[in-house]
Structure formats: C-alpha cells, structure tokens
Amino acid sequence: MIRSWGLFILATSCLIIMLFMVTNNSQKIPSLESLNGQWIGKHKNYEIILAIKKDSKCSLELRIAPSNKVEKFNGDCSIDSTKKPYSFIMTNIIELNTSLYSLVASKNNNIIHMSDFSTKWRLHPVTLTHENTIIFKRYI
C-alpha cells in the first residue's frame, strides 16, 4: 500500500515537472510594440536593416555587400499570430505594388529570427530553416 502511494506521488511529480517544462518553453508571441526599434541582420550577400516605428510604420533597407547598392522599402507592418510560426506582413509599400511576407520568431528582447521575404502569401516559407532564416539583432 505504501509502495503504491510512493509510485503515485512519483508519477504525479513527473507529470507536473513535464507540464511546467512545456509551458515555460512555449514561444512568446512577438508584438510590434516589443519589436520597435532598428534591427540589423546579414543574409547571403545582403546587410538588412529593419526599422519598426511606434505607429506600425516600418522600413526595410537591403544593402548589397560588394556594390554598396541600397534598396529601401517603406510601409505598414503587422504580425499575424493566428498560426505558428507567426507571420510578419509589410503592406502599403510605397516602392512596390505588392506586400512582403515573412515568418518571425522572437528569441529574446534583442534577437529575432525572420524568414526570407516573399511577395506572395502562398509562396512565403512555412517554417524557419537554417537556409531561409535571417538573424536580426537589435541596434542599440
């Protein structure tokens, strides 16, 4: 009888610990407010600067490393948190006739991971992989 109670308590403790670990490791939902500021990342031959302002306006600057050529896009940003991974959407882009779509994952207050940008919703990546991930660091 005492042995069965001991096993019951041990099993219950293990279950509580596993639940605690799962809930603590869940990915935080990034909000535009938490992403406000300037972010810098490098991907392939590009240095990428993403600036998110408090009024949901944002700019994306792509600098091609060897030539120093710069492409800049200005628009409105939002995050769709209805599905995981979360989508970062840049709309009303002055320089383009289309929107830009990406995935976003907040690693901590100073690092975010984003996928390559796509001009079509159906063609944007569905997961973050080593090949398609841009690691942005907050510029302080």
Residue ranges: model-predicted function:
Residues 139-140:
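Short, solvent-exposed mixed-charge patches
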Residues 8-21:
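Hydrophobic membrane-insertion alpha-helices, especially the h-region
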Residues 1-7, 77:
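Positively charged n-region of N-terminal signal peptides that target proteins for export
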